[in-house]
């Protein structure tokens, strides 16, 4: 009976592959279930095989175990389904962006590969640099130099500025660093920045920090081998709101594109439809960042809603969001997608049906592989590195 009860528990956990997590700790578990599926498949396999040859009363547990294993594998199956058309969709979406014909990808570049689930991401060393000093604080960035067969490039390369998440009040530049190393190995400089955070600092302080970071990187471009005409902003969650707001408002011609990982793009709508308090007190988070409730400072909510500043001059945009996100509703990305479409901006919304917030924690998981492919394809389009 213990085996049967354990299988029931594992079965209920497997449902996080399809259902939205109702509570914070279950959300964390959902990231593991969907992006490390083989681990949970292995657990259910062991439980299923235990007692498989025993008496007939074990059959119910065996059937439940088989069903559970199938559910745990579903993110992999769905990742293959999304990958079938991702390459073509990406190329078509960004063909002609910034005067380019679209990325030319070798046949070996596949959006999803089962065997990559077993890979461990390579890393490179970075150096920490102070990029701006204010009267009351200073901000730093972690710089990952573009690599050329294991050595730093000596020619100027594009630079990706990464803005971390953390509800505008937490996190730092060391968050999810695997993608930074991956992009550096692909020939892109990466600057993962720290920025001023709530509640001590409020919007638009982080956007000003991005401007300061771009200024610093331009001024030190010779030393860092940066192509000052090719910057791309990449943000996750709260960092995506900062990155897109900067891309759409500071009108910096060197910003060739912006990448939005599950960011809140409509702050007015987001405040009206808060997350479950069992997950996060999203209204309190927004009030700390913006400086008050919507009823008190409605103009500030409008002013920090990136989609309100989309225009025909906005840079190409890549949006990536999981349908099961319980921290930032995928409706934010759908709304931004519509606004970009209405303004004729080159863009693409990659929807991951099984994924939740933070799915890219595992770069080689189903969501991690697809999003990394999308990011690399986007970069090849909007700021192809100089050979």
Please identify what each model-predicted range represents.
Residues 2, 10, 14-26, 320, ...:
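C-terminal catalytic histidine-bearing segment of alpha/beta-hydrolase fold enzymes
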Residues 17-42, 101-153:
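N-terminal cap/lid segment of alpha/beta-hydrolase-fold proteins
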Residues 93-110, 244-299:
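Hydrolase active-site cap/lid region
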Residues 154-166:
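Short beta-strand element of the alpha/beta-hydrolase
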Residues 155, 218-233:
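Gly/Ser-rich "nucleophile elbow"/oxyanion-hole loop immediately N-terminal to the catalytic nucleophile
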Residues 174-191:
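Short amphipathic alpha-helix adjacent to the substrate-entry channel of hydrolases
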Residues 202-222:
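Alpha/beta-hydrolase active-site loop
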Residues 313, 319-321, 325:
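Short beta-strand/loop motif that positions the catalytic acidic residue
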């Amino acid at each position: 009976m213990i085996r049967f009860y354990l299988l029931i528990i594992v079965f209920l956990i497997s449902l996080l592959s399809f259902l939205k997590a109702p509570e914070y700790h279950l959300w964390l578990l959902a990231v593991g279930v969907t992006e490390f599926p083989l681990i949970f498949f292995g657990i259910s396999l062991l439980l299923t095989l235990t007692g498989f040859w025993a008496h007939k009363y074990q059959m119910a547990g065996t059937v439940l175990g088989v069903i559970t294993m199938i559910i745990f594998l579903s993110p992999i199956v769905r990742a293959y389904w999304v990958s079938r058309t991702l390459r073509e969709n990406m190329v078509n979406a960004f063909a002609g962006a910034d005067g380019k014909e679209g990325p030319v990808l070798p046949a070996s570049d596949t959006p999803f590969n089962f065997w990559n689930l077993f890979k461990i991401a390579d890393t490179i060393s970075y150096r920490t640099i102070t990029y701006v000093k204010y009267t009351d604080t200073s901000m730093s960035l972690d710089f990952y130099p573009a690599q050329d067969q294991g050595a730093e490039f000596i020619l100027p390369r594009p630079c990706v500025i990464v803005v971390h998440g953390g509800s505008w009040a937490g996190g730092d530049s060391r968050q999810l660093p695997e993608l930074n190393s991956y992009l550096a190995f692909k020939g892109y400089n990466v600057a993962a920045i720290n920025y001023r955070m709530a509640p001590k600092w409020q919007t638009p302080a982080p956007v000003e920090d991005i401007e300061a970071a771009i200024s610093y990187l331009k001024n030190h471009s010779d030393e860092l081998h940066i192509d000052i005409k090719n910057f791309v902003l990449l943000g996750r969650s709260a960092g995506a709101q900062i990155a897109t707001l900067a891309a759409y408002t500071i009108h910096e011609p060197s910003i060739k594109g912006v990448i939005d990982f599950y960011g809140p793009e409509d702050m007015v709508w987001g405040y009206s439809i808060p997350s479950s308090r069992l997950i996060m007190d999203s209204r309190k988070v927004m009030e700390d960042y913006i400086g008050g409730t919507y009823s008190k400072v409605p103009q500030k909510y409008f002013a920090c809603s990136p989609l309100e500043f989309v225009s025909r001059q906005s840079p190409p945009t890549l949006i990536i969001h999981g349908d099961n996100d319980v921290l930032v509703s995928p409706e934010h990305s759908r709304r931004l997608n519509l606004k970009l479409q209405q303004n004729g901006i080159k863009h693409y919304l990659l929807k991951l049906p099984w994924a939740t917030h933070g799915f890219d924690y595992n770069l080689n998981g189903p969501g991690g592989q697809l999003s990394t492919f999308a990011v690399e394809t986007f970069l090849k389009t909007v700021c192809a590195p100089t050979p």
